[in-house]
Amino acid sequence: DRISDTHLIDLHKVLAFVKQKADVPVWIVGTSRGTVSATAAAIKLQGEMAGVVLTSSVVSFKKPEAVPRQDLAAIKVPVLVLHHTKDACHLCQPSEVPAILRGLKNAPIKKEIMFSGGANPSGNVCNGQHWHGFIGAEREAVDLIANWIKNPVN
């Protein structure tokens, strides 16, 4: 369970370990089901991270732990939401992504980017070799994230 206390304790330990190794701002980046974890961490481990990046977010309101169903108003760090316009995963429909931004009422900076690059998707639409994983444009997506983290703006 990605919003359980046990999972959050694990995330706390990872954050503490990274901070011990490097004196730099630490961001959490979650992809797909990892967005559930990253969102829960931003809500419950406040002060432990500089910001959050959510890619290919679980947005389906059918899932109790979906990103838009969590207490997004409790997040008080910058948030980037990156999603592929052609993501066909049933839990990650692009049309539901704006619900995340609407919920981030107290994030000082929040940005939604709908991405359209890439090529040659194959296999399961919810896996990394499809639009869900920014297939054919992974480097471009990572560069976009890294550049935004360096200079987060709305």
Predicted regions and their residues:
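Alpha/beta-hydrolase active-site loop
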Residues: 2-21
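Short, conserved loop/helix-junction motifs that constitute active-site signature segments
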Residues: 70-76, 103-107
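Acidic catalytic loop of the alpha/beta-hydrolase fold
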Residues: 61, 85-92
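Primarily recognizes the serine-hydrolase "nucleophile elbow" in alpha/beta-hydrolase
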Residues: 17-74
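Second-shell loop/turn segments in exported
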Residues: 1-5, 86, 130-135
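Short alpha-helix in the alpha/beta-hydrolase fold that links the catalytic acid
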Residues: 67-68, 90-103
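C-terminal catalytic histidine-bearing segment of alpha/beta-hydrolase fold enzymes
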Residues: 109-154
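Short beta-strand/loop motif that positions the catalytic acidic residue
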Residues: 75, 81-83
